Amino acid sequence: MKKFTIYLAGDSTVQSYKTPVKPITGWGQMLHTYFKETEQKMNQDGCDWMGYGKKSDSDFDQSIIYETDGMFIDNRAMAGRSSRSYFDEGRLDDLKKAIKSGDYLFMQFAHNDANKEKEERYVTPEQYEEYLLRYINAAKERDAQPVLVTAIAMRDCDDTPDGKFSVSFPEYRDKMLEIGDKYDIPVIDLGKATDDYLNTVGDEGSKKLFMWLEKGAYEGYPDGKQDNAHLQQAGAKAFAGLLAGLIRSYDRDDKLDKVKAELA
């Protein structure tokens, strides 16, 4: 049977990373590890910093494709992109050239959409719907299945009165849930799942998931780092696992059944 492809569109929290930025890792870089895998060929041209995947046929160099037993995961997410700037740069047009009948388009945006200081990225929640519909319609026009993924939670416990984590970009999450209901599109509420998970691991535990790095621990970050938005490998692995679990438990309809069947 011909393999289908899951395409990922999103931002830095989804992106696959190459050297020398280790250990920053997007959840899209680890998602393949939760599916039935064929034996991986390592260190192919364009692979990620762990040696997995290879350059996809995208016109954009950061895109990396992973092969599993029954499908491909083509990660076309890119740091700093919102639903607006991703579209404006022609990245959706590039994706449209590849996506075909039976494929999936998973999209996670909000981190950059909510940034009012970056005019080229910012969209209001109402505009967010307009842009997401462009992705949804692009998939549907090619008989592919669009899937909405709410944005992962940030490490915001230092900024809340009770030291608890909260759902990030709630207006955009609410709008995405509304879009899912309105247009009958599957929604994977990764934002809520990651918020719940972070409240379980707590303040100190969350530092091992995000880019909190000691000085000298990594060549690319000699001065260390305290980054509450981006994930290191352990965080990307955990969050990808939450996404896989949400796919497995999805029961609103049968639109994700083909993906479920490939989970390990």
State where each predicted segment sits:
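Serine-esterase "nucleophile elbow" of acetyl-processing enzymes
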Residues: M1-A77, D94-S101
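Alpha-helix initiation/capping motif
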Residues: K2-T5, G26, S82, P170-E171, ...
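Glycine-centered flexibility motif
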Residues: G10, S16-K18, G26, G80, ...
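Short, solvent-exposed coil/turn elements at secondary-structure transition points
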Residues: S12, A79-R81, I152, A193
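Short, acidic Gly/Pro/Ser/Thr-rich loop/turn segments
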Residues: V14-Q15, S83, A114, D195
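Acidic/histidine-rich helix-loop elements
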Residues: Y17-T25, A77-S85, E117-V123
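A short linear-motif detector with a strong N-terminal bias
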Residues: G51-S56, S83-Y86, Q226
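Alpha-helical cap/lid subdomain in secreted, periplasmic
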Residues: D88-K237, G241-A264
